[in-house]
Regions:
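Amphipathic alpha-helical dimerization/coiled-coil segments
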Residues: 86-113
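N-terminal helix-turn-helix DNA-binding core of bacterial DNA-binding proteins
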Residues: 5-48
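Short beta-strand "wing" residues that participate in macromolecule-binding interfaces
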Residues: 64
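A cross-family signal for key residues in well-ordered alpha-helices
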Residues: 18, 32, 51, 89, ...
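Basic amphipathic alpha-helical segments that dock to polyanions
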Residues: 49-56
Length: 113
């Protein structure tokens, strides 16, 4: 069994935006989708997860609407807004750039400095 990876600070909102960009989901469905996309590797606490959902909705990056879940229960389904799409694009570019910079630093040997 592979060890779970602790989610780096500041990435949860980006991952929620990505999950919702793949199609509308209720809160728990978003959490499950992130787990699936990570190969069940990320450890996400439900308290911080739902706080992030509400924060994204307040910022206008996702919007919620009441509907019926797959088990016939009332649930709030979230979808990405145009502002959320722009934010996801910006966050993805920033994360990709940062990952490349860190990878470049970590790959350096003493004689390459």
């Amino acid at each position: 069994m592979t060890k779970p990876v602790e989610l780096p600070q500041g990435t949860l909102e980006m991952l929620i935006l990505k999950a919702v960009s793949l199609g509308p989901l209720h809160g728990y469905g978003i959490l499950v989708r992130i787990q699936q996309l990570s190969g069940e590797r990320l450890e996400i606490l439900q308290g911080s997860f739902y706080t992030a959902i509400y924060r994204l909705e307040r910022r206008g990056w996702i919007k919620g609407a009441w509907g019926e879940s797959e088990n016939n229960r009332r649930a709030r389904f979230y979808s990405l807004t145009a502002a959320g799409t722009r934010q996801l694009k910006a966050e993805t570019a920033k994360w990709t750039d940062m990952a490349a910079v860190v990878a470049g630093i970590l790959s350096k040997k003493a004689n390459e400095i």
